Amino acid sequence: MNFIKENSQVLIQRMGMTVIKQILDELFVWNVMNYEEVNVICGEKFEQDAARGVIHMILKKGSEACNLFLKSLEKWNYPLFQELHGLSLFHQMSEEDLDDLAQELKYFYQSPSFLNFYPLGEDIDIMFNLKSTFTEPVLWKKDQHHHRLEQLTLSGLLDTLQSPCIIEGESGKGKSTLLQRIAMLWASGECQALTKFKLVFFLRLSRAQGGLFETLSDQLLDIPDVISKQTFMARLLKLRQRVLFLLDGYNEFKAQNCPEIEALIKENHRFKNMVIVTTTTESLRHIRQFGALIAEVGDMTESSAQALIQEVLRKEFAEDLLLQIQKSRCLRNLMKTPLFVVITCAIQMGKSEFHSHTQTTLFCTFYDLLINKNRHKRKGLAPSEVTQSLDHCGDLALEGVFSRRFDFEPDDLSNVNEDVLLTTGLLCKYTAQRFKPKYKFFHQSFQEYTAGRRLSSLLTSGEPAEVTKGNGHLQKMVSISDITSKYSNLLLYTCGSSAEATRTVLKHLSSVYQHGSLLGLSVTKRPLWRQESMQNMKSTTVQEILKAININSFTECGINLFHESISTSSLSKEFEDFFRGKSLYINSENIPDYLFDFFEDLPNCASALDFVKLDFYGGAVRDISGNQDQEFSGTYIPSRAVSLFFNWKQEFKTLDVTLRDFCKLSKKDIKYLEKIFSSATSLRLHIKRCVGMAGSLSSVLSTCKNIHSLIVEASPLTLEDEQHITSVTNLQTLGVHDLQIQRLPGGLTDNLGNLKNLMKLILDNIQMNEEDALKLAEGLTNLKKMCLLRLTHLSDIGEGMDYIVKSLSAEPCDLKEIQLVSCCLSGNAVKTLAQNLHNLARLSILDLSENHLEKDGKEALQQLIDRLHILEQLTVLMLPWCGDVRVSLARLLEQLERVPQLVKLGLKNWRLTDAEIRILGVFFEKNPLENFQQLDLAGNCVSSDGWLAFMSGFENLKELVFFDFSTKGLLPDASLVRKLSHVLSKLTFLQEVQLVGWQLDDDDVSVLKGAFKLVIA
């Protein structure tokens, strides 16, 4: 009995099912075991469990039963019997044998045959070295709910290793390389956590055949013939946790080929050896329940991707590629997958010069690699079945893009061979902690590429039904906003896949004129447009500004399609049709290479643009070669911008140039600007915060033979500059902002009358006195073509506004917009305006806000309101205030009943009470203004009850973009907050809401918050 007890572990591991059954038959004949006991043992699924059952039963039956058991064992497995008695004919493994075996493994793990590997498969002769190309992975420890618990380093994983350890990750995440790295670290002795292991075995499960002993012999070791399988396996058993198995690729493992390795993972508690096994996400479900530690391979870090690129590419290629990645958000995201980094590097190898490959090229390479690399997994499948499955995968991706779905259900794959898509790596299957599995493409961008590839094949198919299907998808793209957001990448990859598909796409895009929803377009996030409150956008309606941003995005989308397209010269006409009438924004600090190609390859397309906007920035001076330099021997204007515009053989219709934050301007800068300015028929120049340009503006203007618009903002001017401005007689637009210097005789206001062609004049926050205002009024009488006048934030001009208003309105004119905001407007000036309103019949925008009328203000305002019916084209009305002005509200609303086209209304500081606000609410209820966008009711005296009553009419303003209900010390009732929240949820175009002075707590704010800007302080 003691002998059997002492050797029970070896017996359990090595008897085998055949021997067990033979022994059971004899013990049954000898009446040691009964029928039921034999059936129980034979019914065990695993041979080790059967062996364990036999031994436990025999030990319970006493010494005679034990002797009969050993007698039968000697008969049926003589080598094992002899070995247990120390009489084995085979060599027993000594410590020296183990040391030799370990040394042999270490030699192998440090040899070129192990360290050098083919990252793209052996069919592609591109080789990496594990020592030089390995980068530290990001690992995530998972909890029992399959949630990420904490981040681990490789050393952290090894320090806290539990067995079995399962490492999961999608294809291309570097799982195999990780296990190879562990083997290499063990061999080098550099990792303290691995020194406890006597033996480390790295096995590729895709090549596992036979038993564990046979697989080790086949992949790693030449085990001496004198060491039997039983001896070797028994030794591994005794070493327990001093043996580490690195099992790579459970997703490619055929368990029936090697049940011992399957048991090593799933019955690890019996083997006691340490195991790390890798698998893809979709195969995790087969072994997840057996894992003591589960870790996910996370995204590759930016620094790791950079290190890998610099290691495998020539220095100049690496620099060019890193620059390309830096410029592309899509590429930066894709670089989080190691295999994609490898592909991006691989397609540059063997080239004599760097080629900036398109995203489509990279994805196409990746797609084809997946299909070809895994073709051995599709043996036995008909090519037609594979093609059908791939087409369905493309349709799935395409439908997902249109429905914004990036997760798919089993029903979505009901008509396809799921295994084809999973084994090729096109789809990943997620089952952990899910009642139903979820399917995803490995990356959202890859789904969009697969969709674009499929759409391209549909549009160019020889089958009419498929072409119709493809065109049907194009017809779903009916608005610019959807094309530039939802479908931009889909179109990018469609055009990158086929020139003929590009032709079809461009023809469709050229016919798209609907803007679609402008919700989500932010004027504050685009460099093309001034960053200011929605309330201050008085030059045009908010919708028009958003539409301009939308068109600019549409142009950028078209240029991206040009850059991605396979053939551009053959598509010149289609591109020209698309770009005609559109605008383009260029940042001179970051001019992409493809713009040079665009100008050179499709010059007619660039000249077809309505206007091009170009921004220049001051700061550290750069030398002519482009390097920054603090000495003023260099320039601010990049020579790259000069090359782009001056070398171009055609002309833009309009060039809009902005100079920002220039502290100086050299002669070279001015010469560069002249070259750039010459590339357009018409020039718009905007100078913003250029403190150092005082005295230089005249030199700049002298180079502008074609300037039609000049805006100067927060940039000081000398007398010479002002005089030169008024000498540019072809100016059509002039704007001066934030100029707080004393006006000198003979300057701007004295000579404005020289600008006979001026159509738009804007003077904002400039220092003027009454005498300057008088001279300005005299000059205005000569400006017969004026259609827009904005005078804002002018103080200390005394009665100067009386002269200006009289000059403006004395004779019939073409003025369409007048803004006299915060500019000392008097009651007398308003009376004059009212009396002469018939001379301003074409006026559509009248803004007199931020003015307090003192003497005769009430009477003047009533006169103006009484004559508003003259302005049949009125869209914007912003009124001043005075004492007891609210009594004029009823008459104002009577007049506004005739103005259904009203877009903006301002009654700031009218001191409206609950009674008046109810009247205004009834007006909005009875007169739905379809295009109404902005409402300013700040500074009124309305209670919660008044605002609540106002809501029923207010909610009819469906197109509202901005409103201001600011007041002093209003503590809103809960019912008002709830009602306002309900109304806000209906106003889907809202961009900004101002409730300054409303005493709102955190609960109120959380209820009111939406997709708009909420200003409460």
UniProtKB/Swiss-Prot annotation:
Residues 356-463 are annotated as: Winged-helix domain (WHD). Residues 1-88 form the CARD domain. Key component of inflammasomes that indirectly senses specific proteins from pathogenic bacteria and fungi and responds by assembling an inflammasome complex that promotes caspase-1 activation, cytokine production and macrophage pyroptosis. The NLRC4 inflammasome is activated as part of the innate immune response to a range of intracellular bacteria. Residues 95-298 are annotated as: Nucleotide-binding domain (NBD). The gene is NLRC4. One of its GO terms (biological process) is activation of innate immune response. Phosphorylated at Ser-533 following infection of macrophages with S.typhimurium (Salmonella). Phosphorylation is essential for NLRC4 inflammasome function to promote caspase-1 activation and pyroptosis. PRKCD phosphorylates Ser-533 in vitro. It comes from Bos taurus (Bovine). This is NLR family CARD domain-containing protein 4. In an autoinhibited form the C-terminal leucine-rich repeat (LRR) domain is positioned to sterically occlude one side of the NBD domain and consequently sequester NLRC4 in a monomeric state. An ADP-mediated interaction between the NBD and the WHD also contributes to the autoinhibition. Homooligomer; homooligomerizes following activation of Naip proteins by pathogenic proteins such as S.typhimurium (Salmonella) flagellin or PrgJ. Component of the NLRC4 inflammasome, at least composed of NLRC4, caspase-1 (CASP1) and some NAIP family member. Interacts with EIF2AK2/PKR. Gene3D superfamilies: 1.10.1900.50, Death Domain, Fas, P-loop containing nucleotide triphosphate hydrolases, Ribonuclease Inhibitor.
